[in-house]
Amino acid sequence: MSDALVMAGEPLMSGNCFSQMHPVFKAFVCGSLSGTCSTLLFQPLDLVKTRLQAHQLSASAAGSRPRMLNLFIKVIRNENILGLWRGVSPSFLRCIPGVGLYFSTLYTLKHHFFSERDPKPLESVMLGAGSRTVAAVCMLPFTVVKTRYESGKYGYKSVYGALKNIYKTEGPRGLFSGLTATLMRDAPFSGIYLMFYTRAKKLVPQDQIDPLFSPVLNFGCGIVAGILASVATQPADVIKTHIQLSHEKCHWTGQVALNIYQNHGLTGFFRGGLPRALRRTLMAAMAWTVYEQMMEKMGLKS
């Protein structure tokens, strides 16, 4: 199929360097490009989510609770429209290689263990969770910096300066703060998402649909999968944000969860849930749609 695409004059495959790439590296490139698009578009939602959760962490959170729309307006008013993209640099440093690493790891695992058949639902969960674990651990220092940038509580001048400051004041442990909560959030999200996404796609008669509408249908399947996965992993996201915004050097995930419950009840675990669900759902749906379309252009099965 790859040769046929080259002969057909597909621009994506016209260069010899691209056609000679290892399939795993092609998956990395496709994933990185899809991550770039989705991160840039939906960064404002991530910033608002972090601000909502940071407000809950402060002592004044027991009083008035800002709503998502009010926070959007406040950020634009105080920091101008570009303030909504505060923290986009560490987001890029985390998501571009992170999404590429996720998709290339997923591609490797799928083609190693499931080259002859499609994975079953539970196997899809394990594939997604395992791939995300690799990416999340590698990118966690940038996740910590991104969270602190977006909160507006830290005066870091650059990503490098932030990494240096955290390492100097908190040690290597500070760069990996919230690791447990991050894995509790990201691994299940990716596993649940992949399971529902592949199941939803199987319900759609792909052979009876015009290929022109295939990306739209895949995006719709991604929306459904993203909503379900976001709701299931929202508590872990709140815990992760509380840990990474805290000045304390030692954190225990269980203690943070207990504090949230004691101070805010069960609803505290779903603070910032709407902007996160919107962002994660739209980002995942777009990333998968772009990734699969690019892989198809390269003649590879995603």
Swiss-Prot record:
Keyword Iron-sulfur: no
UniProt xrefs under PROSITE patterns: SOLCAR
Any single Gene Ontology cellular-component annotation: mitochondrial inner membrane
Ranges annotated as spanning the membrane: 28-53, 87-113, 125-150, 178-201, 217-243, 272-290
Annotated S-S bridges: none
UniProt keyword terms in alphabetical order: Membrane, Mitochondrion, Mitochondrion inner membrane, Repeat, Transmembrane, Transmembrane helix, Transport
Catalytic activity as recorded in UniProt: glycine(in) = glycine(out)
Bilayer topology annotation: Multi-pass membrane protein
Residue stretches of each Solcar repeat: 22-112, 119-203, 213-297
Record keyword Magnesium present: no
A GO BP annotation: glycine import into mitochondrion
Single GO MF descriptor: glycine transmembrane transporter activity
Cellular compartment(s): Mitochondrion inner membrane
Similarity comment: family membership: Belongs to the mitochondrial carrier (TC 2.A.29) family. SLC25A38 subfamily.
Role according to the record: Mitochondrial glycine transporter that imports glycine into the mitochondrial matrix. Plays an important role in providing glycine for the first enzymatic step in heme biosynthesis, the condensation of glycine with succinyl-CoA to produce 5-aminolevulinate (ALA) in the mitochondrial matrix. Required during erythropoiesis.
Protein name: Mitochondrial glycine transporter
Species of origin: Xenopus tropicalis
Gene label: slc25a38
